[in-house]
């Protein structure tokens, strides 16, 4: 019998090893947080920077790395339009801080890059997007359950790790139970067809394009 899988939820993970990048990012983000009170979005007890991060020259190297990663994803996902890096921001979660469950509307792909993350500093949790699947909870055999049968997934933060996923995927960040701050950078990618809508209805939205 042939088995076919439909409606998958792709999550891309890469561990980047850019010498000196995280040290530079940590220094600049902490300095930014000292001069800007930040925003309140899904963050609880944490600092959320303004969302114009991609336009600041000190973050250009990371922006270029994100473009490279997104180019690969667009090719693998058979997307045939121009891609744009939309808003991008930094997060500082001190011990006890977390982020409530949310999605990223008006975007296509979302992601997070970890600048500093100790063990137990808060997993990224994503939920099964198939709402109808929650009506049944079949009993599973003993042993490891294949990821295609999970109802939620947890991703460990690690300095230098990049995780990218569809913007419609509900996700949250567990509390930071380490004894130090956790620093991450979040961002959203779009397509050319989404540009006009965002320009008309969204304020302070930075758009950067590249060709694939």
Model-derived features: positions:
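Non-heme Fe(II)/2-oxoglutarate
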Residues: 1-80
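Short intrinsically disordered coil segments
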Residues: 29, 126-130, 141, 200-205
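Active-site region of the double-stranded beta-helix
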Residues: 55-86, 94-108, 115-119
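Catalytic core of non-heme Fe(II) oxygenases with the double-stranded beta-helix
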Residues: 93-164, 195
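Catalytic core of Fe(II)/2-oxoglutarate
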Residues: 145-204, 210
């Amino acid at each position: 019998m042939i088995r076919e899988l439909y409606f998958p939820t792709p999550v891309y993970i890469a561990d980047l090893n850019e010498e000196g990048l995280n040290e530079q990012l940590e220094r600049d983000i902490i300095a930014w947080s000292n001069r800007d009170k930040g925003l309140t979005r899904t963050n609880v007890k944490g600092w959320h920077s303004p969302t114009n991060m991609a336009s600041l020259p000190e973050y250009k190297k990371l922006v270029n790395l994100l473009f490279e990663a997104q180019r690969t994803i667009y090719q693998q996902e058979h997307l045939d339009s121009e891609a744009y890096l939309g808003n991008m921001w930094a997060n500082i979660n001190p011990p006890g801080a977390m982020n409530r469950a949310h999605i990223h509307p008006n975007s296509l792909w979302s992601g997070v890059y970890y600048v500093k993350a100790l063990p137990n500093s808060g997993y990224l949790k994503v939920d099964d997007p198939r709402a109808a699947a929650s009506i049944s909870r079949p009993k599973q055999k003993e042993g490891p359950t294949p990821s295609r049968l999970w109802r939620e997934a947890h991703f460990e933060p690690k300095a230098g790790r990049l995780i990218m996923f569809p913007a419609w995927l509900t996700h949250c960040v567990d509390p930071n139970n380490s004894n130090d701050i956790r620093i991450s950078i979040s961002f959203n990618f779009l397509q050319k067809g989404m540009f006009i809508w965002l320009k008309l209805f969204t304020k302070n939205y930075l758009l950067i394009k590249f060709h694939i």
